[in-house]
A protein has these predicted regions:
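Domain-level signature for proteins that mediate thiol-based redox and metal-cofactor handling
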Residues: 1-152
């Protein structure tokens, strides 16, 4: 999702500068994948290294932090607006429950609003879009297909 910064996506967990034993500075950035096995992790890591190198930091280490796992709740408001402007439906709040989960025989989450016309009448086309973190929907009002970033 090139319209988002790693910070706006919520995967950038932290950046710190440490001094090595030889007296040099190294930037250590921590990122969390949106999904286990996220195919964008290598690209995100490479982008971070290149951006920090371009900013004058020749030594960069990128660490993967898996705990706590990423949540779509971590997407910033600026990131959600960027998703909508790019024609994607931003996720709603992630479900956070503990204990027994009731059996649901209908849809497991409410259908998202269309990012183009705003209609609440949309239909799930496919559980998976171009990546596992997105689903495909069609608006029954304007008939446009769109991707929805899943609530995790």
């Amino acid at each position: 999702m090139p319209m988002l910064t790693l910070a706006d996506l919520g995967v950038l967990r932290g950046v710190e500068v440490e001094r090595t034993a030889d007296g040099h500075e190294i930037v250590i950035a921590s990122i969390t994948p949106t999904y286990t096995g996220c195919p964008a992790m290598a690209t995100m890591r490479d982008d971070l290294v290149h951006r920090l190198n371009d900013a004058g930091f020749p030594r960069v280490e990128v660490r993967v932090a898996l705990d706590p796992p990423w949540s779509s709740d971590w997407i910033s408001e600026r990131g959600r607006a960027a998703l909508r402007e790019a024609g994607l439906s931003a996720p709603g709040p992630a479900r956070r429950t503990s204990g027994p989960i009731a059996l649901t025989l209908g849809p497991t989450r409410p259908a998202p609003n269309c990012p183009r016309c705003g209609s609440a009448v949309t239909r799930l086309t496919s559980e998976f879009g171009a990546t596992a973190c997105k689903a495909l929907y069609t608006c029954t009002h304007c008939l446009e297909p769109f991707e929805h970033v899943k609530e995790i």
